[in-house]
Amino acid sequence: VGANLQQVGEACAAGMFDLLEATVEKFQRASQTLKYAQVPTVAAVQGMALGGGCEFVMHASKRVMALESYVGLVEAGVGLIPAGGGCKEFAVRAADWAAQSATPGEVFNYLQPVFMTIAMAKVAKSAVEVVDFGFAKPSDTILFNANELLFVAIKEARALADAGYAPPPMARSIPVAGKNGIATFEMMLVN
């Protein structure tokens, strides 16, 4: 689970915006460090991974999840935008999904469902939904027996390392939907 949202609200009310910005920047650096580490990072997920916890899960090289896992970016439920890198990671994934489709230049159709996932603060209620919602990838591992979680996560990390793991290249440009997409998303929020 991520930041204490009550403390965030109190800091906002007190006008402590410099502290909030510094905290968010540190969290974003931590997320990026997970994603671009020179060694594989494997998230072992059981129970809840909400808010910042979800963002760390999204940035891992691989995820091993107990079937009974609850994962989501819940910040919008209290009027905040997730700021630890989850929104960016969803945009990167939407661009990847579009690039693999028949219409690689049209990213909007892939951004729309993840936008709704973020805006509605949807929480996946099983590891299968975690993949369906896009918080995890189809290649990630789902376990029925949660007692095997740590063993399998370590095994996956070793397998990635033995295969010569290299971090993904840094995303330099992420295609987005532009002004028309922003207008459509704003309309979706109002309706």
PLM ranges: what are they?
Residues 61-83, 134-149:
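Gly/Pro- and small hydrophobic-enriched strand-loop and loop-to-helix capping segments
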Residues 90:
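Short helix- or helix-capping micro-motifs
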Residues 5, 27-36:
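Acidic/glycine-enriched connector segments
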Residues 32-78:
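Glycine-rich beta-to-alpha active-site loop
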Residues 14-19, 33-39, 63-70, 93-110:
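Secondary-structure transition/capping motifs at alpha-helix termini
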Residues 1-26, 79:
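Glycine- (often His-adjacent) and acidic-residue-rich active-site loop
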Residues 4, 56-57, 130:
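Hydrophobic/aromatic residues within transmembrane alpha-helices
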Residues 97-126, 138-140, 144-191:
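Intrinsically disordered, low-complexity segments enriched in small/flexible residues
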